[in-house]
A protein has these predicted regions:
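Short, small-residue-biased leader/transition segments that mark boundaries at the very start
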Residues: 1-4
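Fold-core signature of tandem repeat domains
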Residues: 7-14, 21, 27, 34, ...
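Short, charged/polar, low-complexity loop and linker segments
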Residues: 19-22, 146-152, 178
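Extended intrinsically disordered, low-complexity coil regions enriched in Ser, Thr, Gly, Ala
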Residues: 55-63, 180-186
Length: 257
């Protein structure tokens, strides 16, 4: 009777541990050798509990196998490893310089909620890539804004094209704001980087300047009959030397007067 009772106890131990433990945080994240030791304890117990009544296990065997399950289960270190890795990753993430407050809060919450080392690793890698993308956006603004705004292609561009470029810059500055920037992802940032490049490429100031110079020259030659050829040539030289549409308009207006 005692042997039968112990065998039932072993089967109960198997039943209560064979599914719940392998699905637990403490098992999933444990060192591989500790997982193997636990698995082997279950396998040995399962084999023993299947013995026939003609060849039953001894009480000592049953007790030893039950104890092996408990011991190898208690030796699992997944929760400890997960906590250690979370602490390490949070420290790394906290030191990233280019994320804004909302992004940091979001990834911190995700790290704290992670249940596996694999998930943590993926989170950390994606966060490092996000930080790199934010740095790319920050560097782009530093190298792009002043040269573009000082260029003929921007200064003489259509108003709506300048507005489109400035709108993209404003959105980028908003994202880069440490305190008030929104929680954007890598795809959002890449989309904005593309928007900035497209808006810059669509600026048509140089083309407009050239067209305006040509039209103004034709106007001076054909319409300003009150001027002699030398006067016309002098005005045309001023128009060709000018790099600003507004100044060209002033030159023509002065010539008319």
């Amino acid at each position: 009777y005692t042997t039968l009772f112990r065998s039932k106890d072993l089967r109960d131990t198997l039943e209560s541990n064979s599914t719940s433990v392998p699905n637990s945080v403490n098992y999933i994240n444990a060192d591989k050798n500790l997982q193997i030791e636990f698995d082997e304890a279950l396998q040995q117990a399962s084999a023993t509990s299947s013995k026939t009544s003609e060849n039953p296990a001894t009480i000592e065997e049953v007790l030893g196998l039950s104890q092996a399950i408990y011991d190898t289960k208690n030796a699992l270190n997944g929760e400890q490893r997960l906590a250690t890795e979370k602490s390490k990753d949070l420290k790394l993430i906290k030191g990233l310089k280019d994320l804004n407050k909302a992004q940091l809060e979001d990834v911190t919450n995700k790290v704290n909620a992670a249940n596996t080392l694999t998930e943590l690793s993926q989170l950390t890698q994606s966060t490092l890539k996000l930080n790199d993308k934010m740095k790319l956006l920050r560097d782009k603004l530093k190298t792009l804004v002043n040269p573009v705004k000082a260029s003929l292609n921007y200064r003489n561009a259509d108003y709506n094209l300048k507005r489109q470029f400035n709108k993209a810059l404003k959105e980028a500055k908003g994202i880069l704001n440490k305190n008030s920037g929104p929680n954007v992802n890598i795809n959002d940032i890449q989309h904005l980087l593309t928007q900035i490049d497209n808006a810059k490429d669509q600026l048509n100031g140089e083309q407009r300047l050239k067209e305006h110079q040509q039209k103004s020259e034709v106007y001076v030659i054909k319409e300003l009959d009150i001027l002699n050829n030398a006067q016309k040539a002098a005005i045309i030289n001023q128009i060709r030397a000018s790099k600003d549409i507004k100044i060209i308009n002033q030159i023509v207006d002065n010539a008319i007067e």
